[in-house]
């Protein structure tokens, strides 16, 4: 619902909110509806028992989000370097370092393309970490997730708002 509220789409999604409290909260809130590029990830299915399988699952999830923004591949606002990076992710030829910094890079590319900062929503961000703890690959997964989340959420000039939800208390 949060993604639907903020995300810029070709269809008018305001119809979903006209009978909700947020619509009655005033023009400041209405003005944000449907105005932002959104990165949305969920790690709800990241329940792998080995680091190799978890890494493949994380890459798959990241690649799917890049595919959701396929319009970037033909963007006149992106550099050849950006498009080469995009292609490496989409073609599954990226390195572990490329994937660790993928969300930071994707947010910068979306910001360039749309001319506005990005909203990032990550659901169950801690599921891969919990699985790493349970199955003995905690060091590998925590290093990956630290870089992935830090690249997009810390000191990112392309970030408008970041929302994380977790499963642990």
Indicate residue ranges for each PLM-predicted region.
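Phosphate-binding site recognition
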Residues: 1-169
């Amino acid at each position: 619902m949060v993604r639907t509220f903020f995300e810029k789409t070709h269809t008018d999604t305001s119809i979903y909110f006209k009978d909700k409290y947020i619509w009655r909260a005033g023009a400041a809130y209405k003005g944000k509806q449907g105005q932002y590029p959104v990165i949305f990830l969920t790690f709800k299915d990241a329940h792998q028992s080995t680091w190799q399988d978890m890494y493949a699952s994380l890459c798959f999830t990241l690649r799917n989000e890049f595919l959701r923004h396929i319009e970037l591949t033909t963007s006149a606002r992106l550099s050849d370097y950006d498009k080469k990076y995009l292609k490496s992710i989409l073609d599954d030829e990226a390195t572990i370092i490329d994937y660790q910094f993928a969300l930071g890079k994707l947010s910068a590319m979306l910001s360039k393309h749309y001319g506005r900062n990005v909203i990032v929503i990550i659901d169950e961000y801690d599921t891969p970490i919990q699985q790493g703890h349970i199955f003995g690959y905690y060091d590998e997964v925590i290093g990956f997730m630290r870089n992935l989340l830090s690249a997009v959420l810390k000191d990112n000039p392309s970030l408008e708002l970041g929302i994380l939800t977790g499963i642990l208390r």
